[in-house]
């Protein structure tokens, strides 16, 4: 189809000129010719220097070694500072240390918010206080957490030393000790490597977790005797007594916890048993009411049949009233013979069957309501039916045995049967027929 295009369009489809060939700048890899083939390094070994003339290798420091070196240098530097400060430290020439050293009490671990008046109020119970000196930082002016209390009498200081240790002040338990800087020879404070604490001796395997006056291991490195050596046994006994007291408290708390758990489980079981007992009693009451209702229904139906039979047998008199369905026995028939449409006829049986079916399908609430209504009707009928019964008995005959049941209908007959039982029995009581007392 392109050959039919005009020349101006055919010019658009014309091919371009070929790319001009230029010779390569370098030879191709397969065209290169090496003067020498590949070889080993054996010819060049003689050019290497002798290993015996080489300088020894320099060993670099690892990270662990560098940290250990810095720690060691820090310890050495601190030891030099401690030695320098120890030469200048003299507690006897301290301007802040005034008063009698044997009447002065050292109080540590004090809350930073505790004031001097609070300390005085807490420690005046052991005796009159002469002076209280709280230590503050020289740089920031904040409290350091310890103080010195000077008593007027040495016996008061001994009493506070014995009883005030571990006392809680502002939420913190303080540590109480005597002033050892001026009383113990060669004593050094904590910042200069001394003190009673053992929490800065070294690593975790050397340090103790809790420092205090009751630590017996702190006396191992003490150069001089204690100013109160007879108090050591008392401190040991007090410490053991406190430990035993803490153990007894823990054991008592564990027993209380177990007792609470047992009481809680017992209450839960008792509550469950009571709930199950209530459910069982409800079920038993419901079954008992159902059985009683069935027995009363059966007894009532039996009494109805017997009354109908008795009324049909005595219907030979002229005063017999027609029943609700109008099926009274004929006057000229025999006294004990029932008519074709008597009380036991198919219509009466059908009505009894329908009535029993309807009553059996009633709920418990409807049955209770019917019984209450029947009881009320029976009560009203008993109040106003005395004269009527006497009139009927006075004008009775063969139909006097009917007692007006045929004219009352089904509801009236039911009420009457509940009040009078057949064959010399009274009305049923709790599902049982009661025999009438002989006259």
From Swiss-Prot:
Glycyl lysine isopeptide (Lys-Gly) (interchain with G-Cter in SUMO2) cross-link, renumbered residues: 349
Residues recorded as bearing Phosphotyrosine in the entry: 126
Residues covered by region (Disordered): 48-79, 187-439
Cellular localization per UniProt: Nucleus speckle; Nucleus, Nucleoplasm
Source domain of life: Eukaryota
PTM field: Extensively phosphorylated on serine residues in the C-terminal region.
Region listing for Required for interaction with U1 RNA, in residue ranges: 92-202
Alphabetized UniProt keyword annotations: Acetylation, Isopeptide bond, mRNA processing, Nucleus, Phosphoprotein, Ribonucleoprotein, RNA-binding, Ubl conjugation
Comment, domains: The RRM domain mediates interaction with U1 RNA.
Subunit details: Component of the U1 snRNP. The U1 snRNP is composed of the U1 snRNA and the 7 core Sm proteins SNRPB, SNRPD1, SNRPD2, SNRPD3, SNRPE, SNRPF and SNRPG that assemble in a heptameric protein ring on the Sm site of the small nuclear RNA to form the core snRNP, and at least three U1 snRNP-specific proteins SNRNP70/U1-70K, SNRPA/U1-A and SNRPC/U1-C. Interacts with SCNM1. Found in a pre-mRNA splicing complex with SFRS4, SFRS5, SNRNP70, SNRPA1, SRRM1 and SRRM2. Found in a pre-mRNA exonic splicing enhancer (ESE) complex with SNRNP70, SNRPA1, SRRM1 and TRA2B/SFRS10.
Protein name: U1 small nuclear ribonucleoprotein 70 kDa
Gene: SNRNP70
């Amino acid at each position: 189809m392109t050959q039919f295009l005009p020349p101006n369009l055919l010019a658009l489809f014309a091919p371009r000129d070929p790319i001009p060939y230029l010779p390569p700048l370098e030879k191709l890899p397969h065209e290169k010719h090496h003067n020498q083939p590949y070889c080993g390094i054996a010819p060049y070994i003689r050019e290497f220097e002798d290993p015996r003339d080489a300088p020894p290798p320099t060993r670099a420091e690892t990270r662990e070694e560098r940290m250990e070196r810095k720690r060691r240098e820090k310890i050495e530097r601190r030891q030099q500072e401690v030695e320098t400060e120890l030469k200048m430290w003299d507690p006897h020439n301290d301007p802040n240390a005034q008063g009698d050293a044997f009447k002065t009490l050292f109080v540590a671990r004090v809350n930073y918010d505790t004031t001097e008046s609070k300390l005085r109020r807490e420690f005046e119970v052991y005796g009159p206080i002469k002076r209280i000196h709280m230590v503050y930082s020289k740089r920031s002016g904040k409290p350091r957490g310890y103080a010195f209390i000077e008593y007027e009498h040495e016996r008061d200081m001994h009493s506070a030393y014995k009883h005030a240790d571990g006392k809680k002040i502002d939420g913190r338990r303080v540590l109480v000790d005597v002033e050892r800087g001026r009383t113990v020879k060669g004593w050094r404070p904590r910042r200069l490597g001394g003190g009673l604490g053992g929490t800065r001796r070294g690593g975790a395997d050397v340090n103790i977790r809790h420092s205090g006056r009751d630590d017996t291991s702190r006396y191992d490195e003490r150069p001089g005797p204690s100013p109160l050596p007879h108090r050591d046994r008392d401190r040991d006994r007090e410490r053991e007594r406190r430990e035993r007291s803490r153990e007894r408290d823990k054991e008592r708390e564990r027993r209380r916890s177990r007792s609470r758990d047992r009481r809680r489980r017992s209450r839960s079981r008792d509550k469950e048993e009571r709930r199950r007992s209530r459910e069982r009693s409800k079920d038993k009451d419901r079954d008992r009411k159902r059985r009683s209702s069935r027995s009363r229904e059966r007894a009532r139906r039996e009494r109805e049949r017997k009354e109908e039979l008795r009324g049909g047998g005595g219907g030979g008199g002229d005063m017999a009233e027609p029943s609700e369905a109008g099926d009274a026995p004929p006057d000229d028939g025999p006294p004990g013979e029932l008519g074709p449409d008597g009380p036991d006829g198919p219509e009466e049986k059908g009505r009894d069957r329908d009535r029993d079916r309807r009553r059996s399908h009633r709920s418990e609430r409807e049955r209770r309501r019917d019984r209450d209504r029947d009881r009320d009707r029976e009560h009203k009928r008993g109040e106003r039916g005395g004269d009527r019964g006497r009139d009927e008995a006075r004008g009775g005959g063969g139909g006097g045995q009917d007692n007006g049941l045929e004219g009352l209908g089904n509801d009236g007959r039911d009420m009457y049967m509940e009040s009078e039982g057949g064959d010399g029995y009274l009305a049923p009581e709790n599902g049982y027929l009661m025999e009438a007392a002989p006259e």
